[in-house]
Amino acid sequence: MSWLFGVNKGPKGEGAGPPPPLPPAQPGAEGGGDRGLGDRPAPKDKWSNFDPTGLERAAKAARELEHSRYAKEALNLAQMQEQTLQLEQQSKLKEYEAAVEQLKSEQIRAQAEERRKTLSEETRQHQARAQYQDKLARQRYEDQLKQQQLLNEENLRKQEESVQKQEAMRRATVEREMELRHKNEMLRVETEARARAKAERENADIIREQIRLKASEHRQTVLESIRTAGTLFGEGFRAFVTDRDKVTATVAGLTLLAVGVYSAKNATAVTGRFIEARLGKPSLVRETSRITVLEALRHPIQVSRRLLSRPQDVLEGVVLSPSLEARVRDIAIATRNTKKNRGLYRHILLYGPPGTGKTLFAKKLALHSGMDYAIMTGGDVAPMGREGVTAMHKLFDWANTSRRGLLLFMDEADAFLRKRATEEISKDLRATLNAFLYHMGQHSNKFMLVLASNLPEQFDCAINSRIDVMVHFDLPQQEERERLVRLHFDNCVLKPATEGKRRLKLAQFDYGRKCSEVARLTEGMSGREIAQLAVSWQATAYASKDGVLTEAMMDACVQDAVQQYRQKMRWLKAEGPGRGVEHPLSGVQGETLTSWSLATDPSYPCLAGPCTFRICSWMGTGLCPGPLSPRMSCGGGRPFCPPGHPLL
């Protein structure tokens, strides 16, 4: 009934309707009963200070509520409020109980954690104690081993001393025994010698008589043997001479035997030369694609693949300038059509700086034309001496036996085909050169000759007159260098990184940009030097711990290659023009010298100091339009352009 006192009012009470208003207080009603009693003081007890006004209002409100039409609803509202309070109290009680249970579980968990930590600490202490005990046991065991080792060493030392003493005693005994035996032997020999000498002195006459009798008997035996043999041979020869049939048969047999011996000797030599020309390989040939019987027996699968292979593109794997590509492609097409139509092959000269692809083009030309190729070097001819002429004839005889046609490639031809008038060459080398000129003087439908040289101006004039086509291989420019870098980067880095068992790894960076940058930094380098740079990338990756090729490693290899190239140029410059050594870029056309704008270029410095002369773009072409020779020098060994010449 708390609503009677004006407490616990909420939204539910408002929904049931407002309670009836309290009646207004009557004036003079408060304390009226007290005034009727007079001024007599009220008795003082525990209820003396109690104010019954609230009870009166409550009783009045209860009476009014009983007569009100909302009495039942108010009662229900009061009951519902009481139930709500009870439910709230019960929920709080449940929460208190849950909190108590949670507190108990936390206490149990804390106890378990403490117990676990205690067990862990006990375990750790046990392990530490066990380790300490094990350490003590190991130390005791090691001390025992050391003591045992010391004891064994002491015993071994004593045994060695004992053995040494016994060996010394035995050696002394043996020496004494040998000494006594030697004395006894000497005494015995001396006694026997004395006895033998005495016996010989006493029997000297008998011994001489025995020697005389033996010599007489031997002489009689030899004389009788000679007489008997002479008689037998004489009778046999007399019987042979008197019989004409035997004499005729003997003469015919000896004649046939001599004819057979000489015929077999000559036939064997002819057969050997035929087999060598057809099946063997001349000694001057270093490498050939021509199939021999021995090679077919050793590698039948590879030989069958080569026989079934189709002609390849002449420029596959070869990077050249566009103008040079067009020219060599025309040469390849002409050579292939010449083979198809069984025409006469032309002789070709490939000249230019080293490492520009001359040998590779010769191989590709042979494979593209369906011909066999054979590679020889000019430096192998001079050491042969007197055998050079025979070897040269064998080489061309072997070339004429090719059914598919043979491309004979001579690398470093300037080492052999030098000028006979000015160069000091031996008589044997001169004879070999004459034999070579004889075979080169006429065209053939069996072979074509391809010469490669870095110094073609040293050729004999007879060689120059026999050359049909001259092709100049130049150093690669920016575009060709970038193509070369990409080609060798793909062959030496990308393919090993994705194929094969022993793979190398490649870091992530812009490969195209890096190839372009390397092509820019390798200005002046040949194709061979760029290929060596790619191989150094691969070797650096294999030499690293993780096998990863990074951009920094590539940059280091490029810097090293550039430094090596500059060092080579310094060496080349130090040789000087009088030593017969030329700069790789000298004697070439103007488009190659575009990177040499000033003579102060550090790659080819002027010996006279600072120089401002420019290079003639017509140098080495023979087409200089100026009034002066383009071979003029600035005074420091640096050629410059005379007035009227086009400059680079």
Curated annotation (Swiss-Prot):
<keyword id="KW-0175">Coiled coil</keyword>
<dbReference type="GO" id="GO:0005739">
    <property type="term" value="C:mitochondrion"/>
</dbReference>
<dbReference type="GO" id="GO:0030667">
    <property type="term" value="C:secretory granule membrane"/>
</dbReference>
<feature type="intramembrane region" description="Helical">
    <location>
        <begin position="247"/>
        <end position="264"/>
    </location>
</feature>
<feature type="binding site">
    <location>
        <begin position="352"/>
        <end position="359"/>
    </location>
    <ligand>
        <name>ATP</name>
    </ligand>
</feature>
<feature type="modified residue" description="N-acetylserine">
    <location>
        <position position="2"/>
    </location>
</feature>
<dbReference type="GO" id="GO:0005886">
    <property type="term" value="C:plasma membrane"/>
</dbReference>
<dbReference type="InterPro" id="IPR027417">
    <property type="entry name" value="P-loop_NTPase"/>
</dbReference>
<protein>
    <recommendedName>
        <fullName>ATPase family AAA domain-containing protein 3B</fullName>
    </recommendedName>
</protein>
<dbReference type="GO" id="GO:0101003">
    <property type="term" value="C:ficolin-1-rich granule membrane"/>
</dbReference>
<feature type="topological domain" description="Mitochondrial intermembrane">
    <location>
        <begin position="265"/>
        <end position="648"/>
    </location>
</feature>
<keyword id="KW-0472">Membrane</keyword>
<dbReference type="Pfam" id="PF00004">
    <property type="entry name" value="AAA"/>
</dbReference>
<dbReference type="InterPro" id="IPR003593">
    <property type="entry name" value="AAA+_ATPase"/>
</dbReference>
<feature type="region of interest" description="Disordered">
    <location>
        <begin position="1"/>
        <end position="54"/>
    </location>
</feature>
<dbReference type="InterPro" id="IPR003959">
    <property type="entry name" value="ATPase_AAA_core"/>
</dbReference>
<comment type="subunit">
    <text>Forms heterooligomers with ATAD3A. Interacts with components of the mitochondrial ribosome, including MRPL11 and MRPS18B, and with other proteins involved in mitochondrial RNA metabolism, possibly via interaction with ATAD3A. Interacts with GADD45GIP1.</text>
</comment>
<keyword id="KW-0999">Mitochondrion inner membrane</keyword>
<dbReference type="Pfam" id="PF12037">
    <property type="entry name" value="ATAD3_N"/>
</dbReference>
<feature type="region of interest" description="Disordered">
    <location>
        <begin position="111"/>
        <end position="134"/>
    </location>
</feature>
<feature type="coiled-coil region">
    <location>
        <begin position="69"/>
        <end position="214"/>
    </location>
</feature>
<dbReference type="GO" id="GO:0005524">
    <property type="term" value="F:ATP binding"/>
</dbReference>
<comment type="function">
    <text>May play a role in a mitochondrial network organization typical for stem cells, characterized by reduced mitochondrial metabolism, low mtDNA copies and fragmentated mitochondrial network. May act by suppressing ATAD3A function, interfering with ATAD3A interaction with matrix nucleoid complexes.</text>
</comment>
<keyword id="KW-0547">Nucleotide-binding</keyword>
<feature type="compositionally biased region" description="Basic and acidic residues">
    <location>
        <begin position="32"/>
        <end position="48"/>
    </location>
</feature>
<dbReference type="GO" id="GO:0007005">
    <property type="term" value="P:mitochondrion organization"/>
</dbReference>
<feature type="compositionally biased region" description="Pro residues">
    <location>
        <begin position="17"/>
        <end position="26"/>
    </location>
</feature>
<keyword id="KW-0067">ATP-binding</keyword>
<feature type="modified residue" description="N6-acetyllysine">
    <location>
        <position position="427"/>
    </location>
</feature>
<keyword id="KW-0496">Mitochondrion</keyword>
<dbReference type="InterPro" id="IPR021911">
    <property type="entry name" value="ATAD3_N"/>
</dbReference>
<keyword id="KW-0007">Acetylation</keyword>
<dbReference type="GO" id="GO:0005743">
    <property type="term" value="C:mitochondrial inner membrane"/>
</dbReference>
<feature type="compositionally biased region" description="Basic and acidic residues">
    <location>
        <begin position="111"/>
        <end position="125"/>
    </location>
</feature>
<feature type="modified residue" description="N6-acetyllysine">
    <location>
        <position position="495"/>
    </location>
</feature>
<dbReference type="GO" id="GO:0016887">
    <property type="term" value="F:ATP hydrolysis activity"/>
</dbReference>
<comment type="similarity">
    <text>Belongs to the AAA ATPase family.</text>
</comment>
<feature type="topological domain" description="Mitochondrial intermembrane">
    <location>
        <begin position="2"/>
        <end position="246"/>
    </location>
</feature>
